[in-house]
Amino acid sequence: MTPEHLPTEQYEAQLAEKVARLQSMMAPFSGLVPEVFRSPVSHYRMRAEFRLWHDGDDLYHIMFDQQTKSRIRVDTFPAASQLINTLMKAMIAGVRDNHALRHKLFQIDYLTTLSNQAVVSLLYHKKLDEEWREAATALRDALRAQGLNVHLIGRATKTKIELDQDYIDERLPVAGKEIIYRQVENSFTQPNAAMNIQMLEWALEVTKDSKGDLLELYCGNGNFSLALTRNFNRVLATEIAKPSVAAAQYNIAANHIDNVQIIRMAAEEFTQAMNGVREFNRLQGIDLKRYQCETIFVDPPRSGLDSETEKMVQAYPRILYISCNPETLCKNLETLSQTHTVSRLALFDQFPYTHHMECGVLLTAR
């Protein structure tokens, strides 16, 4: 695979290899055959970052080969959304001959939605002044005149200039309902929107007969929390990143949801609060004992669950675990399988044509 070519004819073979690999990794814990969720074979990534290369009068996007570190020119990027590909051409055309926009520009980040909105961030090794703002405003207006719903942001050391806003609102159809998700520039969002819909619908399906409340750790912008509210009486969710918490609060209001409570704290801190080890001012007014959480949802970073959180989640009858790293999932399962069994297993092909696997397991108490 190269940035400008996807081996789409190999899609089924690479997916079958992942299924076999996941099944082999999970064999010590489960004999289940993974439920498999396919990605679109192209134009599946909703965000992308590129370095910019200045070559005389020419200017173009580049990526670096992960093995050789050699520079690769990228004029089209079929892994990314059609809108990103359109914007890549438009941005180069708009910046190449404009000194204020081009000078010291070293990176462009693109964030798009299925609803065809975009935020484009231009990163500089220079101070951004009024001349830059005027040039960027003219470029934004020219892009909008082409029918592109785009917002531009300029970034430099200790500087961020938003011409309008630093977010876009995604609208995802999830199991018959549209959910609005505010996505903030430079914050984590699910990169493969089509796969995200399938992940949300799978999580809904495996928790459809749930009782009581849901506790979610690492909730981000509320991606899973908002979808899962319909299966639970209440949802209590934790997140540490301020922009994600703000986006989650907006999403709760935008979707008219009244049974989700977001707490800004790390999973490790929440574990201490639940165990009565420490008291936190952020929990004033929230009676944790009121919640009857019989299901816990975790979507941890690549490092997986720490040992204290492992112990904490074992107290719940059902654990729904979305993993972006099956190796750390299996490490966690060495502990979790002492008290729980794997009752559902899914593979989500979030990043086709790569080694990367995303998977989901539902664990039920023995």
Curated annotation (Swiss-Prot):
InterPro entries: MeTrfase_TrmA_AS, MeTrfase_TrmA_CS, SAM-dependent_MTases_sf, TrmA_MeTrfase, U5_MeTrfase_fam. It holds the Pfam family tRNA_U5-meth_tr. GO terms for cellular component: cytosol. Keywords: Methyltransferase, S-adenosyl-L-methionine, Transferase, tRNA processing. NCBIfam families: trmA_only. PANTHER family: TRNA/TMRNA (URACIL-C(5))-METHYLTRANSFERASE, TRNA_TMRNA (URACIL-C(5))-METHYLTRANSFERASE. This is tRNA/tmRNA (uracil-C(5))-methyltransferase. It comes from Salmonella paratyphi C (strain RKS4594). The gene is trmA.
